[in-house]
């Protein structure tokens, strides 16, 4: 079946400027073109031809002033083409809608990122200025910790959505892992890894020296017990006069500071309440894990932490800062409640560290061993038991090494250097001088040895050997006290300090669409 449609097009004749006919001024003379298009309805006989466009020859008929073009063009619009067109339009509209929704999501994310960055820009400025670490004080100087404070600040900065803190890490969580990480990064940024390399080579020596100190301490106890057994077996006692063993045993019972401090040195008597320190109280805790962003600690972290502590806190030889304690580094090492107790604990540790090389030197020096045997023979003259004499000689060597260690620590606390490994020239204490140690006749201040180690070097060793978790928590305790007393922040608490946070957000888009996403931020 065919239906013909005639479309007539009229065009102006060339050369006719006014658009009026020469014969009829009131009528416009135009050329009429006739284009007849046949709409073809397919039937069963010519289905194959339904997919073809058929054109017939066009003929131009000239009729005087008019030119008429006649002919036929057959056009077809199939169901397939219609569906294709609909699908194409649907795809375009779907892509447009998807892009629009994605753009709305991006705007919400941008709002949230901006708000989170603004909140983390509100770090505690005194903490950064004096201790070079970043943290938000979640109490906001109110004295009360609340995560709602952080959510309110997010809303204030434009993230007015349904927000919930999915995970949060405070400074005191995980034994101060976050604080230690920031302290280490500060040291690497300021000094570089090369600064730590010069100490990393000594760490194995320090560990070995600590192990040897434990072994020699056990050996000393075993030697003392063995001598007592021998004496008990003979039902005798060593004489009390001119007895190095008894004299040194008495020195060990006396306060160590009486032996090692320079004459007329005034010891700080400042104290703190141990129960108020983060190490001993119940602290605020965060929630959630940050295993995806946490770094593994190691030897380097211990060295960096020790360097950070020595740079930011005062020790016995430094000028006091005016905080709750004067000997801050000693507190970090010992954790006692008073300056005196902390200094005593550190001095005892130093004596033990120096005891190892001193005893090893005596074991290799035949001259001094001979002196010890002679003194033991004098003590045991009445006993006439060789085993007792030999045990007493070993006991005298141990006592002599202890006395030399006291002299070494006295040297260190005087701000001088002591030899790492002793020789005849650097050995300070004679056997006769051992009997004067701790008496009125004891006037030696210790000899300064060029190229040796000073007090700060040994403190660095002690910091490395101490447990990192304890050091970190005590360090944060000193910071808290200093912030409260020195830097006029009475409500500051270290367990209110936030360093990492992830926020879960739900927002409403148009037409009831909900969008959930997470935003993480942490100080690096």
Model-found features: residue ranges?
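Generic structural motif recognizing short loop/turn segments at the entrances and edges of beta-strands
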Residues: 1-6, 33, 114, 164-167, ...
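Alpha-helical assembly-interface signal, strongest on the long, hydrophobic N-terminal helix that forms
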Residues: 6, 47, 57-58, 63-145
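Long, compositionally biased low-complexity segments
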Residues: 133-524
């Amino acid at each position: 079946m065919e239906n013909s449609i005639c479309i007539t097009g009229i065009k102006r004749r060339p050369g006719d400027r006014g658009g009026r006919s020469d014969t009829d001024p009131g009528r416009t003379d135009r050329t009429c073109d006739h284009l007849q298009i046949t709409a073809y309805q397919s039937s069963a006989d010519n289905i194959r031809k339904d997919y073809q466009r058929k054109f017939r020859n066009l003929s131009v008929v000239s009729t005087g002033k008019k030119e008429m073009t006649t002919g036929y063009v057959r056009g077809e619009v199939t169901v397939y083409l219609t569906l294709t067109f609909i699908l194409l339009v649907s795809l375009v509209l779907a892509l447009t809608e998807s892009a629009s929704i994605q753009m709305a999501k991006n705007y919400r994310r941008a709002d949230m990122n901006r708000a989170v960055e603004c909140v983390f820009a509100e770090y505690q400025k005194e903490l950064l200025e004096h201790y070079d670490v970043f943290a938000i004080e979640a109490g906001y100087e109110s004295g009360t910790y609340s995560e709602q404070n952080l959510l309110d600040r997010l809303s204030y900065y434009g993230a007015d959505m349904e927000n919930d803190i999915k995970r949060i890490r405070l400074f005191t969580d995980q034994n101060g892992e976050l604080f230690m990480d920031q302290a280490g990064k500060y040291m690497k940024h300021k000094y570089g890894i090369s600064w730590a390399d010069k100490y990393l080579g000594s760490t194995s020596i320090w560990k070995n020296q600590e192990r040897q100190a434990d072994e020699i301490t056990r050996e000393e106890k075993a030697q003392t017990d063995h001598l007592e057994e021998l004496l008990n077996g003979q039902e005798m006692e060593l004489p009390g006069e001119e007895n190095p063993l008894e004299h040194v045993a008495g020195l060990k019972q006396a306060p160590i500071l009486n032996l090692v401090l320079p004459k007329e040195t005034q010891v700080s008597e400042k104290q703190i309440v141990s129960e108020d320190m983060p190490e001993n109280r119940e602290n605020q805790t965060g929630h959630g894990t940050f295993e995806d962003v946490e770094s593994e600690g190691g030897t380097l972290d211990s060295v960096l932490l020790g360097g950070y502590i020595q740079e930011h806190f005062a020790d016995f030889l430094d000028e006091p800062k005016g905080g709750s304690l004067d000997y801050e580094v000693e507190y970090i090492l010992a954790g006692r409640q008073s300056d005196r107790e902390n200094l005593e604990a550190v001095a005892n540790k130093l004596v033990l560290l120096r005891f190892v090389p001193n005893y090893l030197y005596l074991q290799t020096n035949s001259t001094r061993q001979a002196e010890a045997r002679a003194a033991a023979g004098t003590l045991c003259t009445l006993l006439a038991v060789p085993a007792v004499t030999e045990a007493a000689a070993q006991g005298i060597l141990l006592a002599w090494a202890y006395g030399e260690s006291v002299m070494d620590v006295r040297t260190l606390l005087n701000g001088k250097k002591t030899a790492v490994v002793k020789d005849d020239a650097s050995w300070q204490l004679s056997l006769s001088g051992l009997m004067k140690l701790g008496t009125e006749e004891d006037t030696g201040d210790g000899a300064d040895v060029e190229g040796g180690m000073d007090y700060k070097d040994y403190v660095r060793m002690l910091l490395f050997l101490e447990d990192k978790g304890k050091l970190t928590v005590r360090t944060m305790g000193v910071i808290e006290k200093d912030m409260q007393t020195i830097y006029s922040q009475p409500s500051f608490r270290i367990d209110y300090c936030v360093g990492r946070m992830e926020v879960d957000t739900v927002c409403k888009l148009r037409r009831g669409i909900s969008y959930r996403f997470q935003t993480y931020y942490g100080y690096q």
